């Protein structure tokens, strides 16, 4: 937890941004896996963490801008709770740690909201992403699930604070990135032909645990790298395979790291793997070199895509003008996803608040296949923390689909592409902070080139 002054200042800035009304924060509850008392690992709502700092279940909070009140709602622990959980701080003690002096029982929240509604004042709330939040909004405001109308001023106020990382946040994110790097280095050290994917996943996840961290998202450790988010870990690693690892640590304060690496199963990459890998690295480095304030991230994405197309053209897999191929969307055969995303208290920071505000600054998103998956497109500014993760993927089903529809035949050499059906896919990912003059990698460096990876094997 940061000093209470941090949370006081954040709430003050948010009040000034929104201007009037009641700001409603719904904290997360415990969630049972298969019965009520056997719960998933608890994770507080990130905006609740950002403004209130308390990672406890069963809380809600309001900022009443018009009346100048900040209240945390929750129930004190009973003797039964203490028997099972031990002595805990009181709700009032927890609130004081984040600069809040007023607390009320959770049952009082509905009465407070009803009073505000009766006064014809605005109740601002955020997009619900959990069923429990939808039910609470229905109880508090009579809003049926699916009919929510989240407050745009509230969303924009939060985005305009959380997008810009402070020095104390950057230090916490860097810690997450350092642990994340150690996770990937461990995967490179332990991987052997004959292992199951889940053995590698277990080894790298143990590193996070050993550093007192959780995972920032479910680990990807797969020999089927053509599947972008593959959480299956049951394959046996064979000679000639590449293992794609996408994994990250989350600190006790909730800040995330997110890196990817692609590792040869044996001691060396094959010549064909190295050819594709080198193109990916070139696209990665081009994107990193372009990072600086004032640059639109969509332009960095386009640059990375052009480098990929140029490289694949050199191998005979693509043809024509790379810039035209990217403009028309032919690159998405090999790169059907985005280049990166914002990162902070969420690995995809504030994705629950809407990409249109977080990554696009209110501007519309493209509907083009591949480009529509770009989570970040806006102009870069100092304080932004983001990922760089271009990839090259050979997806047999997509190859067959586009070939049958004769898509982009001016740019894609389908005959040559057939020999790459079994290639799978690869990506590498690093985390960057936009500075006043450029960008700085966060966390310990992990191997990026084929030579660097092979040196770890």
What does each of the following model-derived ranges do?
Residues 1-457:
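Active-site neighborhoods and metal-handling regions in enzymes and metal-associated proteins
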């Amino acid at each position: 937890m940061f000093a209470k002054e941090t949370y006081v200042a954040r709430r003050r800035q948010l009040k000034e941004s929104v201007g009037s009304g009641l700001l409603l924060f719904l904290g997360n509850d415990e969630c049972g896996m298969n019965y009520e008392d056997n719960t998933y690992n608890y994770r507080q709502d990130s905006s609740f963490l950002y403004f209130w700092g308390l990672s406890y279940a069963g809380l809600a909070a309001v900022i009443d801008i018009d009346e100048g009140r900040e209240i945390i709602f929750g129930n004190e622990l009973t003797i039964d709770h203490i028997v099972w959980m031990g002595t805990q701080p009181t709700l009032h003690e927890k609130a004081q740690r984040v600069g809040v002096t007023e607390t009320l029982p959770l049952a009082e929240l509905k009465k407070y909201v009803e009073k505000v509604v009766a006064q014809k004042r605005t109740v601002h709330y955020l997009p619900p992403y959990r069923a429990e939040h939808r039910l609470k909004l229905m109880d508090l405001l009579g809003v049926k699930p699916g009919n929510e109308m989240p407050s745009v001023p509230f969303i924009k106020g939060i985005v305009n604070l959380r997008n810009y990382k402070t020095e104390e946040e950057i230090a916490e994110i860097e810690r997450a990135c350092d642990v994340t790097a150690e996770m990937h280095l461990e995967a490179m050290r332990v991987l052997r032909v004959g292992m199951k994917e889940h053995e590698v996943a277990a080894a790298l996840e143990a590193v996070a645990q050993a550093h007192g961290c959780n995972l920032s998202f479910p680990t990807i450790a797969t020999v089927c790298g053509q599947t972008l988010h593959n959480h299956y870990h049951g394959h046996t690693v064979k000679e000639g395979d590449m293992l794609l690892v996408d994994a990250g640590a989350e600190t006790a304060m909730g800040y995330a790291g997110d890196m990817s690496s692609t590792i040869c199963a044996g001691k060396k990459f094959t010549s064909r793997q190295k050819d594709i890998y080198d193109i990916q690295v070139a696209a990665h480095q081009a994107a990193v070199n372009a990072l600086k304030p004032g640059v639109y991230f969509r332009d960095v994405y386009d640059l990375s895509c052009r480098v990929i197309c140029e490289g694949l053209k050199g191998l005979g897999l693509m043809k024509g003008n790379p810039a035209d191929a990217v403009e028309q969307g032919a690159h998405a055969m090999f790169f059907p996803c985005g280049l990166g995303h914002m990162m902070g208290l969420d690995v995809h920071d504030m994705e629950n608040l809407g990409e249109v505000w977080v990554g696009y600054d209110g501007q519309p998103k493209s509907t083009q296949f591949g480009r529509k998956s770009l989570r970040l497109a806006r102009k870069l500014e100092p304080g932004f923390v983001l990922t760089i993760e271009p990839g090259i993927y050979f997806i047999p089903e997509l190859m067959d689909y586009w070939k049958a529809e004769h898509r982009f035949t001016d740019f894609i050499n389908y005959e040559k592409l057939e020999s790459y059906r079994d290639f799978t896919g690869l990506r590498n990912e690093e985390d960057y902070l936009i500075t006043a003059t450029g960008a700085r990698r966060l966390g310990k460096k992990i191997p990026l080139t084929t030579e660097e990876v092979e040196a770890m094997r």
